């Protein structure tokens, strides 16, 4: 189980990303449409003034149940350990153990 402070930090980042999503996107579109270098630099400065954690690249996928940051499956939102346990107990519909 991951530290609760790290899980809460990720939750705050998700909220910030959602809050500044449209502002960040509009500024990026303005940069594409800008004609002069001064305009681009001014808009870029506004973009840099946004909170650092509002950038979507700072988000990290974590396991929905345990908060484990590594080896997550995107389809399920679970780490490999939890996925294996849940698959063995038939809690994931449609997931079967492969054999050949």
Swiss-Prot record:
Pfam families: Ribosomal_S14. This is Small ribosomal subunit protein uS14c. One of its GO terms (molecular function) is rRNA binding. Its main location: plastid. The lineage of its organism: Eukaryota, Viridiplantae, Streptophyta, Embryophyta, Tracheophyta. Belongs to the universal ribosomal protein uS14 family. Keywords: Chloroplast, Plastid, Ribonucleoprotein, Ribosomal protein, RNA-binding, rRNA-binding. Coiled coil: none annotated. NCBIfam families: PRK08881.1. The keyword Chloroplast applies. GO terms for biological process: translation. Part of the 30S ribosomal subunit. It is found in: Plastid, Chloroplast. Binds 16S rRNA, required for the assembly of 30S particles. Gene3D superfamilies: 1.10.287.1480. It comes from the Eukaryota. GO terms for cellular component: chloroplast; small ribosomal subunit.
């Amino acid at each position: 189980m991951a530290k609760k402070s790290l899980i809460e930090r990720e939750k705050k980042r998700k909220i910030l990303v959602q809050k500044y999503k449209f502002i960040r996107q509009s500024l990026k579109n303005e940069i594409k449409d800008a004609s002069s270098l001064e305009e681009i630099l001014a808009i870029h400065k506004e973009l840099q003034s946004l909170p650092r954690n509002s950038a979507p690249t700072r988000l990290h996928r974590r396991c929905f149940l345990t908060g484990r940051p590594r080896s997550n499956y995107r389809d399920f939102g679970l780490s490999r350990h939890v996925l294996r346990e849940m698959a063995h107990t038939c809690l994931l519909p449609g997931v079967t153990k492969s054999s050949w």
